[in-house]
């Protein structure tokens, strides 16, 4: 299979690069920035991409690739920090920009002459690109020339033109992998298909086939258990692994007391439709007792992760493997296991797990984004009712009840959230939104109901649109709709007298509040 390797220098967008490549039908793999040239040669990639990163190339411990990668006979593309690393290696100069550039910028193509069009920018006009950098290239390396510029970055795109490897090393100061770059997909296609000569041969079906074969070989005659919640991720993971293991996969559904209204009953009904080997465990009292008086979201996540494992270990027999529906966004927001990406928060499926666990992990979806998981699920005949569910965090409502968690506070949140979701479905808005939910805030506010003064809870409604969970924009729901939802919640849910709507995008905010 043709493949592309992305070296991770710490950008929060690194996995997006891999995703965009896969959208072109080409398999991509992310490796640490320090992977040796020899190790890369053994993998035989058809192209190499250097990601962006949060550091400066002049920092004392700035990550730098093996210098011998430039001797590999494959095209190389550097993005943002990747461009700067290439430029520094070849003798160019990088300096702190007097004006940092974050967001959209107008890019203008620079042509040496009418007959010397850059292969990278073939059929790409002047257009909008997405910038996210503090440093910038100030002096070209010898043998390179400019192919694009912006008002603040005169050396916005460069490529080599002399000596061995002509038209084989390229650099971009902007991010083609981000949707805001108008012709980002076309640019990556030019690099991978036209320049590297790669024939697309990767697809969700080929992923399924290779993953089933991998799991069969990994598990052999042993057995596995699956932490299944009824959500998209765990359900698709369970069905995929069951295709490899059959009855050797034992699925465990844990009612942790942190689910949405009537969710436990609905989940069990849906899972039976999948024909999975299922055991249900009611551990709600255990989870709530361990979360009593815990306020820190990080502690909540770690407690929930440890408790999940404890419950599993009490209900296993001879299983040696644990299946989880971990996705790329889970990994990137917790810690980059493949490079120096900065940690945002611990995810239940990743860093929240105890280090000394008896079960070996199988994470079949770890390299996929949410939309790719849905495509895989569709091919595996997972019901649409499951595939269209909005994302739900592993720690459940514990991270939507801000502050301490109790059954009483959870019940208040459940009722409010049920009204919000019910109205979204009634108004045919649910499937138009990536994710929607309600957050119970750790404050009480003054209100008036009838002739009485109230001092009760406030909630925040959150609805966002996204394609992959890496970036998200708040959903512009109609004002009349929001007013109707607010009115229902305040009148029908005892203990709430104020409803707010979250209009924060990601970044700078994350989708979940905790």
From Swiss-Prot:
SUPFAM superfamilies: Adenine nucleotide alpha hydrolases-like, Class I glutamine amidotransferase-like, GMP synthetase C-terminal dimerisation domain
Domain GMPS ATP-PPase, chain residue ranges per copy: 202-389
Residues annotated for ATP binding in this entry: 229-235
Gene3D superfamilies xref list: 3.30.300.10, 3.40.50.880, HUPs
EC number: 6.3.5.2
Annotated active site: 80 (nucleophile), 175, 177
Disulphide linkage map: none
Catalytic reaction annotation: XMP + L-glutamine + ATP + H2O = GMP + L-glutamate + AMP + diphosphate + 2 H(+)
Glutamine amidotransferase type-1 domain span: 3-201
Keyword tags: ATP-binding, Glutamine amidotransferase, GMP biosynthesis, Ligase, Nucleotide-binding, Purine biosynthesis
Keyword ATP-binding: yes
PROSITE patterns according to UniProt: GATASE_TYPE_1, GMPS_ATP_PPASE
InterPro entries recorded: Class_I_gatase-like, GATASE, GMP_synth_C, GMP_synth_GATase, GMP_synthase, GMPS_ATP_PPase_dom, NAD/GMP_synthase, Rossmann-like_a/b/a_fold
CDD domains hit by this protein: GATase1_GMP_Synthase, GMP_synthase_C
Record pathway: Purine metabolism; GMP biosynthesis; GMP from XMP (L-Gln route): step 1/1
Record GO terms (molecular function): ATP binding; GMP synthase activity
Gene Ontology cellular component terms for the protein in this record: cytosol
Function: Catalyzes the synthesis of GMP from XMP.
Assembly: Homodimer.
Annotated protein name in UniProt: GMP synthase [glutamine-hydrolyzing]
Taxonomic lineage: Bacteria, Pseudomonadati, Chlorobiota, Chlorobiia, Chlorobiales
Gene: guaA
